[in-house]
Structures are given as C-alpha cells and as structure tokens.
Amino acid sequence: MKIKMLFLSFASLVLPSCSSVQTVGGAGMIMNYGSTMEGRSADIRTITFPSGKRMIYGLTVTGGRKPNWRHAVGTTEGMSGDTRGIPEWLDFEWREPSYPGLKMKDFPSDEAYSKAVSEKYSKLTTKTQRVFIKSRIPPEVVHEAIESRLHVQKGQGLPEKSLWIYFIWTDDGIKFRWDLYCTKPCVTKEGGDEVD
C-alpha cells in the first residue's frame, strides 16, 4: 500500500494535459502500464485519443513473467490527474523488442551501438490496438471517484478514492483492468479482462 500511495502522490502531479476531454467534475484517473510478456518489452510509440490528439511516447515496459500481473514491473503516471473526463478509448501503437536488449558494453563504440539498435528496431513490426475504457467501468464507480474528489478541500491533498486504470501487455495483446483505490478501508471494486 505504501508503494501505491507514493505512486499516487507522484502521478497526481504529472501529465496534467494528457486528456483530450476537459470535463469539469470528471473522475480523473491514474494509469499503470505493465507487461507479463517473457523475453520481450513493449516499446510504446504513440497513444491516440478519440479527438484525434496523438501523444508521442518513449515509454518502454519491460517484459518478464510474474506469478500475478499485479507483480509485473510497471510504470505509473497521471492521466487526467485533476478533474478531467475518462476517454471512451485509446489507440496504442507499439513495438516489441527482445528483452533484455542490446548492451552498449558489447560494442566497440557508441556509434556502433546506435547503428545496431537502429537496425534492430527497423526490423520490428509495429502493432496497434484500440482499448475501450469508459464503457467498461461501471457508472457508479466513476460517480464514487467524482464524489470523493469533490470532497477534497483545497490544500488537503488526495481524495480518499481514486480510479486506477491498468494496461497490461500480454502475448495476446493489451489487457485492460480497473480498480477503485481507497486510502481508507472500503469494499474492493475492480474489473476488466482476465489476465493469466
């Protein structure tokens, strides 16, 4: 829980302009990218919003099979970290290089290393997938997140309930999960795809 709280504190401060929908009183959300792929990473190139806004990414989610997707190494960030709305869907574009990848120490020079990396990436297939979000989260869960956010006094800090969104790269593509995270004891609410 301490780790998640640290992520939450950090994520609420970053990427304040990611969402293409400025909805007053929106739920906002925190995004986590993870991977259960073994021997491959997910090199995220772009994320496109329903509005057509396209974000260029340089984010790589490392591979490695874990007993549970929640234990997979991931990256957490704020997506609509303030009061913005939840997008209907997001289009992801990524490549899957081998993991671990090339190491600079194995090459005679930086130039040789850069050339090898460029050649390796040029041969990779670019994959795409649309992940639906808003329709898969129960309205009452979104309402709880909104209500919790509205009750936060200025300068008080984080709301008691926050919506977390998970994108997990698997051998079968991107899986989607969500949960309503509580800073105090509450009934666990979560849903989405089954992830082996």
Question: Which stretches of residues belong to each language-model region?
Answer:
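Bacterial N-terminal signal peptides that target proteins for export
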Residues: 1-7
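C-terminal motif of bacterial Sec signal peptides marking the signal peptidase cleavage site
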Residues: 16-17
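Short, surface-exposed binding/anchoring microloops in extracellular/periplasmic proteins
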Residues: 22-53
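Short, surface-exposed beta-strand/loop "edge" segments at domain boundaries and coil↔beta transitions
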Residues: 39-44, 100-103, 174-176
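Tryptophan-paired
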Residues: 47-99
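Mature extracytoplasmic domains of secretory-pathway proteins
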Residues: 79-143
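Compositionally biased low-complexity segments at domain edges in trafficked proteins
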Residues: 119-196
